[in-house]
């Protein structure tokens, strides 16, 4: 059963948005995902001193950054390395990749087809990601991109699939992004002004996610590969790796 537990899992930082814990989700075998192990988020470079004091309490061991190198150069890495986290950059989209995606699927915004295009950039990122997930020493993990919704959403959907969460839970977790959109747009508008070409409505749309995107993505993975686990097996993630991830992240 999917319940509305957003308030319990969302961490409301002043200068960082879409930051939440995936703990507590129930899985098909009756287990639940452990709290305080895996956080998903957007960029952290605008965190305030108050935010950073709170972030220390999370004791993040590994920061997995899914952004392109040019995004990192522009935005910086945020404070977690200084707080003791090991930093890993796994660029889901390489520099120039957004333009290639636009050519492949059209510049139609967030879509399942666009998410499927992430897989066409190669398997190395996904194999490395799940090997990181399989090492208990890497936890707690913070996984993020810029907005914490697309690259982070796809990665988290894969992980939730491996852990045995059903599609309703995966959909609901993905859509929780929309719960922090208004606060994020308020922050941008008040501190920087809206980007050129955007009004408040279009900015809200850009910062949010449509349910069709994750549904179409996972349907596409099912059609192409047989499902997320089948895709991950195909690229080299082993049964032993899956087992270690479940042992780390699931309650008994």
Where do the model's predicted regions map?
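Ser/Thr-glycine-rich phosphate-binding loops at phosphate-binding pockets of nucleotides
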Residues: 147, 151-152
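Cys-dependent protein tyrosine phosphatase-like superfamily
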Residues: 1-142, 154-252
């Amino acid at each position: 059963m999917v319940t509305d537990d957003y308030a319990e899992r969302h961490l409301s930082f002043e200068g960082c948005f879409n930051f939440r814990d995936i703990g507590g989700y129930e899985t098909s075998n009756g287990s639940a995902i452990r709290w305080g192990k895996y956080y998903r988020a957007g960029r952290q470079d605008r965190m305030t001193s108050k935010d950073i004091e709170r972030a220390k309490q999370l004791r993040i061991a590994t920061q997995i950054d899914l952004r392109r190198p040019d995004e990192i150069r522009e935005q910086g890495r945020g404070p977690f390395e200084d707080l003791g986290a090991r930093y890993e950059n796994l660029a889901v989209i390489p520099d120039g990749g957004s333009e290639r995606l636009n050519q492949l699927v059209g510049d139609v915004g967030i879509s399942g087809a666009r998410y499927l295009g992430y897989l066409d950039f190669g398997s190395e990122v996904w194999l490395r990601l799940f090997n990181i997930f399989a090492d208990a020493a890497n936890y707690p993990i913070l996984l993020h991109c810029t907005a914490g919704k697309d690259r982070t959403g796809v990665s988290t959907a894969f992980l939730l699939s491996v852990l045995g969460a059903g599609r309703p839970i995966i959909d609901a977790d993905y859509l929780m992004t929309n719960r922090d959109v208004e606060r994020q747009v308020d922050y941008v508008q008040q501190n920087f002004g809206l980007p050129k070409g955007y009004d408040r409505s279009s900015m809200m749309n850009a910062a949010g996610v449509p349910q069709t995107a994750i549904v179409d993505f996972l349907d596409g993975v099912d059609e192409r590969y047989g499902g997320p686990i089948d895709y991950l097996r195909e690229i080299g993630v082993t049964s032993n790796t899956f087992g270690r991830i479940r042992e780390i992240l699931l309650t008994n």
